[in-house]
Amino acid sequence: MVRLEKNDPLMLARQLPLKTVALILAGGRGTRLKDLTIKRAKPAVHFGGKFRIIDFALSNCLNSGIRRIGVITQYQSHTLVQHIQRGWSFFSEEMNEFVDLLPAQQRVHGENWYRGTADAVTQNLDIIRRYGAEYIVILAGDHIYKQDYSHMLIDHVEKGARCTVACLPVPVAEAAAFGVMDVDENDLIIDFVEKPANPPTMPSDPTKSLASMGIYIFDAEYLYDLLEEDDKDENSSHDFGKDIIPKITKAGMAYAHPFPLSCVQSDPTAEPYWRDVGTLEAYWKANLDLASVTPELDMYDQNWPIRTHMESLPPAKFVQDRSGSHGMTLNSLVSGGCIISGSVVVQSVLFPRVRINSFCNIDSSVLLPDVWIGRSCRLRRCVIDRACIIPEGMVIGENAEEDARRFYRSEEGIVLVTREMLRKLQIKQER
Protein backbone atom coordinates (compact mmCIF):
# COMPACT_ATOMS: atom_id res chain seq x y z
CA MET A 1 0.00 0.00 0.00
CA VAL A 2 1.37 3.39 -1.04
CA ARG A 3 0.89 6.02 1.68
CA LEU A 4 -0.26 9.35 0.26
CA GLU A 5 1.61 12.53 1.18
CA LYS A 6 -1.39 14.85 0.77
CA ASN A 7 0.50 18.01 1.66
CA ASP A 8 3.19 17.46 -0.95
CA PRO A 9 1.98 17.90 -4.57
CA LEU A 10 5.20 16.48 -6.01
CA MET A 11 4.89 13.32 -3.94
CA LEU A 12 1.21 13.04 -4.85
CA ALA A 13 2.12 13.29 -8.54
CA ARG A 14 4.44 10.31 -8.06
CA GLN A 15 2.28 8.24 -5.73
CA LEU A 16 -1.19 8.52 -7.26
CA PRO A 17 -0.27 7.01 -10.65
CA LEU A 18 1.10 3.96 -8.82
CA LYS A 19 -2.38 3.38 -7.37
CA THR A 20 -4.10 3.86 -10.73
CA VAL A 21 -5.13 1.77 -13.73
CA ALA A 22 -5.99 3.45 -17.03
CA LEU A 23 -8.63 1.90 -19.29
CA ILE A 24 -8.51 3.09 -22.90
CA LEU A 25 -11.74 2.63 -24.86
CA ALA A 26 -10.44 1.70 -28.30
CA GLY A 27 -13.27 -0.23 -29.92
CA GLY A 28 -14.85 2.60 -31.90
CA ARG A 29 -15.43 2.37 -35.63
CA GLY A 30 -15.22 6.09 -36.42
CA THR A 31 -17.82 6.09 -39.21
CA ARG A 32 -17.39 9.83 -39.88
CA LEU A 33 -13.89 9.08 -41.19
CA LYS A 34 -15.60 7.19 -44.00
CA ASP A 35 -13.47 4.59 -45.80
CA LEU A 36 -10.39 5.27 -43.63
CA THR A 37 -11.97 3.04 -40.97
CA ILE A 38 -13.41 0.26 -43.10
CA LYS A 39 -10.51 -2.04 -42.24
CA ARG A 40 -9.20 -0.48 -39.02
CA ALA A 41 -10.59 0.91 -35.77
CA LYS A 42 -10.41 4.68 -35.40
CA PRO A 43 -7.67 4.53 -32.69
CA ALA A 44 -5.49 2.60 -35.18
CA VAL A 45 -5.73 5.28 -37.90
CA HIS A 46 -2.38 6.82 -38.85
CA PHE A 47 -1.65 10.35 -37.65
CA GLY A 48 1.14 12.91 -37.70
CA GLY A 49 3.58 11.28 -40.10
CA LYS A 50 4.50 8.19 -38.06
CA PHE A 51 2.02 7.64 -35.23
CA ARG A 52 -1.35 5.99 -34.64
CA ILE A 53 -4.08 7.97 -32.89
CA ILE A 54 -4.00 5.71 -29.82
CA ASP A 55 -0.31 6.53 -29.27
CA PHE A 56 -1.33 9.85 -27.71
CA ALA A 57 -3.44 8.32 -24.93
CA LEU A 58 -0.82 5.63 -24.32
CA SER A 59 2.02 8.17 -24.24
CA ASN A 60 0.07 10.38 -21.85
CA CYS A 61 -0.29 7.41 -19.50
CA LEU A 62 3.41 6.56 -19.70
CA ASN A 63 4.56 10.17 -19.24
CA SER A 64 2.10 10.62 -16.34
CA GLY A 65 3.57 7.64 -14.50
CA ILE A 66 0.62 5.30 -15.14
CA ARG A 67 2.11 1.99 -16.20
CA ARG A 68 -0.89 -0.30 -15.73
CA ILE A 69 -3.09 0.06 -18.77
CA GLY A 70 -6.00 -1.89 -20.22
CA VAL A 71 -6.95 -1.35 -23.87
CA ILE A 72 -10.55 -2.34 -24.60
CA THR A 73 -11.01 -3.35 -28.25
CA GLN A 74 -13.87 -4.47 -30.46
CA TYR A 75 -14.30 -3.28 -34.07
CA GLN A 76 -11.63 -4.33 -36.62
CA SER A 77 -9.05 -4.75 -33.87
CA HIS A 78 -6.27 -6.68 -35.64
CA THR A 79 -4.29 -3.64 -36.82
CA LEU A 80 -4.63 -2.02 -33.40
CA VAL A 81 -3.60 -5.15 -31.51
CA GLN A 82 -0.63 -5.68 -33.81
CA HIS A 83 0.51 -2.07 -33.33
CA ILE A 84 0.33 -2.32 -29.53
CA GLN A 85 2.13 -5.65 -29.48
CA ARG A 86 4.94 -4.27 -31.63
CA GLY A 87 5.26 -0.80 -30.16
CA TRP A 88 4.12 -1.07 -26.54
CA SER A 89 5.54 -4.36 -25.28
CA PHE A 90 8.39 -2.83 -23.27
CA PHE A 91 6.62 -2.66 -19.90
CA SER A 92 8.16 -4.65 -17.04
CA GLU A 93 6.07 -7.49 -15.66
CA GLU A 94 8.41 -7.69 -12.66
CA MET A 95 7.48 -4.07 -11.80
CA ASN A 96 3.75 -4.83 -12.21
CA GLU A 97 3.62 -2.82 -15.44
CA PHE A 98 1.50 -3.89 -18.41
CA VAL A 99 -0.61 -3.01 -21.41
CA ASP A 100 -3.42 -5.55 -21.26
CA LEU A 101 -5.59 -6.09 -24.35
CA LEU A 102 -9.26 -6.63 -23.51
CA PRO A 103 -11.19 -7.69 -26.64
CA ALA A 104 -14.95 -8.15 -26.81
CA GLN A 105 -15.60 -11.85 -26.22
CA GLN A 106 -19.33 -12.15 -25.40
CA ARG A 107 -18.18 -13.20 -21.94
CA VAL A 108 -21.10 -11.81 -19.93
CA HIS A 109 -24.28 -11.32 -21.93
CA GLY A 110 -24.36 -14.31 -24.22
CA GLU A 111 -24.51 -13.06 -27.79
CA ASN A 112 -24.02 -9.38 -26.91
CA TRP A 113 -20.80 -7.59 -27.76
CA TYR A 114 -20.04 -4.37 -25.90
CA ARG A 115 -23.38 -2.56 -25.68
CA GLY A 116 -21.89 0.83 -24.80
CA THR A 117 -18.80 2.47 -23.32
CA ALA A 118 -19.79 1.59 -19.76
CA ASP A 119 -20.67 -1.98 -20.70
CA ALA A 120 -17.22 -2.37 -22.26
CA VAL A 121 -15.78 -1.87 -18.77
CA THR A 122 -18.52 -3.89 -17.05
CA GLN A 123 -17.83 -6.97 -19.17
CA ASN A 124 -14.20 -6.90 -18.00
CA LEU A 125 -14.83 -6.16 -14.31
CA ASP A 126 -13.55 -9.53 -13.13
CA ILE A 127 -10.21 -8.81 -14.82
CA ILE A 128 -10.09 -5.15 -13.78
CA ARG A 129 -10.76 -5.95 -10.11
CA ARG A 130 -7.69 -8.17 -10.08
CA TYR A 131 -5.53 -5.17 -10.96
CA GLY A 132 -6.08 -3.93 -7.39
CA ALA A 133 -6.29 -0.24 -8.30
CA GLU A 134 -7.64 2.50 -6.03
CA TYR A 135 -8.36 4.82 -8.96
CA ILE A 136 -9.54 4.11 -12.49
CA VAL A 137 -8.87 6.53 -15.35
CA ILE A 138 -11.23 6.07 -18.31
CA LEU A 139 -9.86 7.40 -21.60
CA ALA A 140 -10.96 7.58 -25.22
CA GLY A 141 -8.42 6.09 -27.58
CA ASP A 142 -9.27 8.36 -30.49
CA HIS A 143 -8.33 11.91 -29.43
CA ILE A 144 -5.18 13.95 -30.06
CA TYR A 145 -3.85 15.83 -27.03
CA LYS A 146 -1.15 15.88 -24.36
CA GLN A 147 -2.26 15.71 -20.73
CA ASP A 148 -0.60 14.95 -17.41
CA TYR A 149 -3.12 12.65 -15.75
CA SER A 150 -1.24 12.90 -12.44
CA HIS A 151 -2.41 16.53 -12.14
CA MET A 152 -5.99 15.46 -12.73
CA LEU A 153 -5.58 12.70 -10.13
CA ILE A 154 -4.36 15.26 -7.59
CA ASP A 155 -7.40 17.43 -8.35
CA HIS A 156 -9.67 14.39 -7.90
CA VAL A 157 -8.20 13.51 -4.50
CA GLU A 158 -8.00 17.07 -3.16
CA LYS A 159 -11.66 17.74 -3.99
CA GLY A 160 -12.75 14.50 -2.35
CA ALA A 161 -14.52 13.53 -5.57
CA ARG A 162 -15.85 10.08 -6.38
CA CYS A 163 -15.82 10.95 -10.08
CA THR A 164 -13.94 13.69 -11.97
CA VAL A 165 -14.67 14.69 -15.57
CA ALA A 166 -12.15 16.60 -17.69
CA CYS A 167 -13.80 19.53 -19.43
CA LEU A 168 -13.03 22.20 -22.01
CA PRO A 169 -15.01 25.18 -23.36
CA VAL A 170 -16.10 24.64 -26.98
CA PRO A 171 -18.08 26.86 -29.39
CA VAL A 172 -21.83 26.44 -28.95
CA ALA A 173 -22.14 25.43 -32.60
CA GLU A 174 -19.94 22.38 -31.92
CA ALA A 175 -21.26 21.48 -28.46
CA ALA A 176 -24.06 19.20 -29.68
CA ALA A 177 -21.42 16.55 -30.38
CA PHE A 178 -20.35 16.41 -26.70
CA GLY A 179 -21.66 15.92 -23.22
CA VAL A 180 -22.30 19.43 -21.87
CA MET A 181 -22.19 20.37 -18.20
CA ASP A 182 -22.92 23.19 -15.81
CA VAL A 183 -20.73 23.61 -12.71
CA ASP A 184 -20.79 25.66 -9.52
CA GLU A 185 -17.96 27.80 -8.11
CA ASN A 186 -16.29 24.68 -6.64
CA ASP A 187 -16.39 22.76 -9.96
CA LEU A 188 -19.17 20.48 -8.70
CA ILE A 189 -21.15 19.37 -11.75
CA ILE A 190 -24.77 20.40 -11.17
CA ASP A 191 -26.14 19.45 -14.59
CA PHE A 192 -24.95 17.14 -17.38
CA VAL A 193 -26.61 16.50 -20.74
CA GLU A 194 -25.18 14.17 -23.38
CA LYS A 195 -25.16 15.61 -26.92
CA PRO A 196 -27.99 18.12 -26.41
CA ALA A 197 -29.84 19.58 -29.40
CA ASN A 198 -29.70 23.02 -27.76
CA PRO A 199 -26.50 23.09 -25.69
CA PRO A 200 -26.57 25.30 -22.58
CA THR A 201 -23.96 28.06 -22.60
CA MET A 202 -21.40 29.05 -20.01
CA PRO A 203 -22.54 31.94 -17.77
CA SER A 204 -19.17 33.63 -18.24
CA ASP A 205 -19.21 33.27 -22.04
CA PRO A 206 -22.51 32.85 -23.94
CA THR A 207 -20.62 31.80 -27.09
CA LYS A 208 -19.18 28.69 -25.41
CA SER A 209 -20.44 25.52 -23.75
CA LEU A 210 -18.51 23.50 -21.17
CA ALA A 211 -17.93 20.13 -22.83
CA SER A 212 -16.88 16.77 -21.44
CA MET A 213 -13.70 15.43 -23.05
CA GLY A 214 -14.59 11.80 -22.34
CA ILE A 215 -11.80 11.59 -19.76
CA TYR A 216 -12.97 10.34 -16.35
CA ILE A 217 -11.36 9.45 -13.03
CA PHE A 218 -13.27 7.25 -10.57
CA ASP A 219 -12.63 5.86 -7.14
CA ALA A 220 -12.34 2.22 -8.18
CA GLU A 221 -14.83 0.60 -5.80
CA TYR A 222 -17.35 3.37 -6.46
CA LEU A 223 -17.08 2.70 -10.21
CA TYR A 224 -17.51 -1.04 -9.77
CA ASP A 225 -20.71 -0.53 -7.77
CA LEU A 226 -22.07 1.91 -10.35
CA LEU A 227 -21.40 -0.45 -13.24
CA GLU A 228 -22.94 -3.46 -11.53
CA GLU A 229 -26.05 -1.42 -10.78
CA ASP A 230 -26.19 -0.07 -14.34
CA ASP A 231 -25.83 -3.57 -15.75
CA LYS A 232 -29.11 -4.55 -14.10
CA ASP A 233 -30.98 -1.53 -15.49
CA GLU A 234 -32.93 -2.64 -18.56
CA ASN A 235 -33.62 0.98 -19.50
CA SER A 236 -29.95 1.94 -19.59
CA SER A 237 -27.92 2.27 -22.78
CA HIS A 238 -24.86 1.35 -20.66
CA ASP A 239 -22.91 4.41 -21.72
CA PHE A 240 -20.77 6.71 -19.57
CA GLY A 241 -22.00 9.93 -21.14
CA LYS A 242 -25.66 8.98 -21.46
CA ASP A 243 -26.17 7.07 -18.22
CA ILE A 244 -23.31 6.93 -15.71
CA ILE A 245 -22.22 10.58 -15.54
CA PRO A 246 -25.79 12.01 -15.41
CA LYS A 247 -26.59 9.59 -12.58
CA ILE A 248 -23.51 10.62 -10.58
CA THR A 249 -24.31 14.28 -11.24
CA LYS A 250 -27.79 13.89 -9.75
CA ALA A 251 -26.19 12.31 -6.69
CA GLY A 252 -23.88 15.33 -6.33
CA MET A 253 -20.74 13.19 -6.62
CA ALA A 254 -19.17 14.42 -9.89
CA TYR A 255 -16.64 17.22 -10.24
CA ALA A 256 -15.23 18.95 -13.30
CA HIS A 257 -11.52 19.25 -14.00
CA PRO A 258 -10.58 22.18 -16.27
CA PHE A 259 -8.31 20.78 -18.97
CA PRO A 260 -5.88 23.76 -18.91
CA LEU A 261 -4.79 22.68 -15.40
CA SER A 262 -3.27 19.46 -16.74
CA CYS A 263 -2.72 20.15 -20.44
CA VAL A 264 0.93 19.74 -21.43
CA GLN A 265 2.12 22.49 -23.76
CA SER A 266 5.45 24.10 -24.50
CA ASP A 267 3.94 27.59 -24.75
CA PRO A 268 1.93 28.34 -21.59
CA THR A 269 0.22 31.26 -23.35
CA ALA A 270 -1.17 29.07 -26.14
CA GLU A 271 -4.70 27.68 -26.20
CA PRO A 272 -4.88 24.13 -24.75
CA TYR A 273 -4.75 21.63 -27.61
CA TRP A 274 -7.33 18.83 -27.82
CA ARG A 275 -8.77 17.44 -31.04
CA ASP A 276 -11.41 14.88 -31.85
CA VAL A 277 -10.26 14.02 -35.37
CA GLY A 278 -13.54 12.25 -36.04
CA THR A 279 -14.34 13.78 -39.43
CA LEU A 280 -12.29 13.70 -42.60
CA GLU A 281 -11.82 17.48 -42.55
CA ALA A 282 -10.77 17.51 -38.87
CA TYR A 283 -8.32 14.67 -39.53
CA TRP A 284 -6.85 16.39 -42.60
CA LYS A 285 -6.62 19.76 -40.87
CA ALA A 286 -4.98 18.39 -37.70
CA ASN A 287 -2.36 16.55 -39.76
CA LEU A 288 -1.52 19.58 -41.89
CA ASP A 289 -1.28 21.84 -38.84
CA LEU A 290 1.68 19.75 -37.68
CA ALA A 291 3.52 20.78 -40.85
CA SER A 292 2.98 24.51 -40.27
CA VAL A 293 5.75 26.84 -39.09
CA THR A 294 4.33 27.05 -35.55
CA PRO A 295 2.00 24.06 -35.05
CA GLU A 296 -0.54 24.17 -32.25
CA LEU A 297 0.63 20.74 -31.04
CA ASP A 298 4.33 20.50 -30.20
CA MET A 299 5.56 17.09 -31.33
CA TYR A 300 9.18 17.97 -30.57
CA ASP A 301 8.84 18.36 -26.79
CA GLN A 302 11.46 16.01 -25.35
CA ASN A 303 9.89 16.37 -21.91
CA TRP A 304 6.66 14.77 -23.16
CA PRO A 305 7.57 12.41 -26.01
CA ILE A 306 4.95 10.60 -28.06
CA ARG A 307 6.01 6.97 -28.47
CA THR A 308 5.06 4.61 -31.27
CA HIS A 309 6.22 1.47 -33.05
CA MET A 310 9.53 2.38 -34.69
CA GLU A 311 10.42 0.62 -37.93
CA SER A 312 14.01 0.39 -39.14
CA LEU A 313 13.82 2.66 -42.17
CA PRO A 314 16.41 4.57 -44.18
CA PRO A 315 16.29 8.38 -44.10
CA ALA A 316 13.98 10.30 -46.42
CA LYS A 317 15.62 11.19 -49.73
CA PHE A 318 15.08 14.14 -52.08
CA VAL A 319 16.73 13.56 -55.45
CA GLN A 320 17.15 15.16 -58.83
CA ASP A 321 15.59 13.22 -61.68
CA ARG A 322 17.28 12.60 -65.02
CA SER A 323 15.83 15.78 -66.53
CA GLY A 324 17.45 17.87 -63.80
CA SER A 325 14.27 18.60 -61.80
CA HIS A 326 14.92 18.75 -58.07
CA GLY A 327 12.89 16.97 -55.41
CA MET A 328 11.93 19.55 -52.79
CA THR A 329 9.50 20.22 -49.96
CA LEU A 330 8.20 23.28 -48.12
CA ASN A 331 6.39 23.30 -44.75
CA SER A 332 5.93 19.53 -44.80
CA LEU A 333 6.51 16.46 -42.65
CA VAL A 334 8.41 13.72 -44.47
CA SER A 335 8.92 10.37 -42.72
CA GLY A 336 11.62 7.74 -43.03
CA GLY A 337 11.85 5.68 -46.19
CA CYS A 338 10.28 8.36 -48.43
CA ILE A 339 11.78 9.24 -51.82
CA ILE A 340 10.83 12.43 -53.64
CA SER A 341 12.27 12.49 -57.15
CA GLY A 342 12.08 15.70 -59.17
CA SER A 343 8.77 16.80 -57.60
CA VAL A 344 7.49 19.56 -55.33
CA VAL A 345 5.67 18.86 -52.03
CA VAL A 346 4.09 21.81 -50.20
CA GLN A 347 2.24 21.91 -46.84
CA SER A 348 1.78 18.14 -46.75
CA VAL A 349 2.37 15.12 -44.51
CA LEU A 350 4.12 12.06 -45.92
CA PHE A 351 4.06 8.85 -43.88
CA PRO A 352 6.80 6.19 -44.16
CA ARG A 353 7.87 4.71 -47.51
CA VAL A 354 5.94 7.13 -49.73
CA ARG A 355 7.41 7.33 -53.23
CA ILE A 356 6.75 10.39 -55.41
CA ASN A 357 8.02 10.14 -58.97
CA SER A 358 9.06 12.99 -61.27
CA PHE A 359 7.13 16.12 -62.29
CA CYS A 360 4.49 15.87 -59.52
CA ASN A 361 2.99 18.68 -57.48
CA ILE A 362 1.63 17.69 -54.06
CA ASP A 363 -0.14 20.45 -52.14
CA SER A 364 -1.98 20.33 -48.78
CA SER A 365 -2.26 16.56 -48.80
CA VAL A 366 -1.84 13.63 -46.40
CA LEU A 367 -0.21 10.53 -47.87
CA LEU A 368 -0.38 7.43 -45.66
CA PRO A 369 2.34 4.73 -45.62
CA ASP A 370 3.47 3.00 -48.82
CA VAL A 371 1.65 5.36 -51.20
CA TRP A 372 3.18 5.39 -54.69
CA ILE A 373 2.63 8.44 -56.92
CA GLY A 374 3.30 8.08 -60.65
CA ARG A 375 4.86 10.76 -62.82
CA SER A 376 3.18 14.08 -63.61
CA CYS A 377 0.45 13.84 -60.96
CA ARG A 378 -1.17 16.81 -59.24
CA LEU A 379 -2.73 16.28 -55.81
CA ARG A 380 -4.41 18.98 -53.76
CA ARG A 381 -6.39 18.79 -50.48
CA CYS A 382 -6.30 14.98 -50.48
CA VAL A 383 -6.02 12.12 -48.03
CA ILE A 384 -4.51 9.12 -49.82
CA ASP A 385 -5.01 5.85 -47.92
CA ARG A 386 -2.27 3.33 -47.27
CA ALA A 387 -0.55 1.60 -50.21
CA CYS A 388 -2.54 3.39 -52.91
CA ILE A 389 -0.94 3.48 -56.35
CA ILE A 390 -1.78 6.74 -58.12
CA PRO A 391 -1.23 6.30 -61.86
CA GLU A 392 0.81 8.60 -64.06
CA GLY A 393 -0.86 11.90 -64.90
CA MET A 394 -3.75 11.65 -62.42
CA VAL A 395 -5.13 14.95 -61.10
CA ILE A 396 -7.04 15.00 -57.81
CA GLY A 397 -8.47 18.00 -55.97
CA GLU A 398 -8.94 20.42 -58.88
CA ASN A 399 -12.33 19.36 -60.28
CA ALA A 400 -15.02 18.93 -57.62
CA GLU A 401 -17.46 17.08 -59.87
CA GLU A 402 -14.82 14.68 -61.14
CA ASP A 403 -13.48 14.06 -57.63
CA ALA A 404 -16.95 13.26 -56.27
CA ARG A 405 -17.60 10.83 -59.14
CA ARG A 406 -14.37 8.89 -58.65
CA PHE A 407 -13.66 9.16 -54.93
CA TYR A 408 -15.18 10.45 -51.69
CA ARG A 409 -15.32 14.25 -51.52
CA SER A 410 -16.43 15.92 -48.28
CA GLU A 411 -18.61 19.02 -48.12
CA GLU A 412 -15.47 20.99 -47.30
CA GLY A 413 -13.74 19.73 -50.45
CA ILE A 414 -11.35 17.19 -48.90
CA VAL A 415 -10.89 14.17 -51.17
CA LEU A 416 -10.34 10.67 -49.75
CA VAL A 417 -8.76 8.08 -52.05
CA THR A 418 -8.54 4.36 -51.21
CA ARG A 419 -7.29 1.29 -53.04
CA GLU A 420 -10.85 0.01 -53.45
CA MET A 421 -11.93 3.27 -55.11
CA LEU A 422 -9.00 3.07 -57.51
CA ARG A 423 -9.75 -0.56 -58.34
CA LYS A 424 -13.31 0.43 -59.28
CA LEU A 425 -11.71 2.78 -61.81
CA GLN A 426 -9.83 -0.24 -63.23
CA ILE A 427 -6.54 1.10 -61.88
CA LYS A 428 -4.23 -1.73 -60.90
CA GLN A 429 -3.14 -1.59 -57.25
CA GLU A 430 -0.24 -4.03 -57.41
CA ARG A 431 3.27 -3.15 -58.58
Curated annotation (Swiss-Prot):
Organism: Enterobacter sp. (strain 638)
Summary of activators and inhibitors of this protein: Allosterically activated by fructose-1,6-bisphosphate (F16BP) and inhibited by AMP.
Gene behind this protein: glgC
Molecular-function annotations in GO: ATP binding; glucose-1-phosphate adenylyltransferase activity
Binding residues for AMP: R40, H46, R52, R130, R386
Gene3D superfamilies for this protein: Hexapeptide repeat proteins, Spore Coat Polysaccharide Biosynthesis Protein SpsA, Chain A
UniProt entry tagged with the keyword Iron: no
Alphabetical list of HAMAP family matching this protein: GlgC (MF_00624)
GO terms under biological process: glycogen biosynthetic process
Keyword Nucleotide-binding tagged: yes
Protein name: Glucose-1-phosphate adenylyltransferase
Site, as annotated: Could play a key role in the communication between the regulatory and the substrate sites: Q74, W113
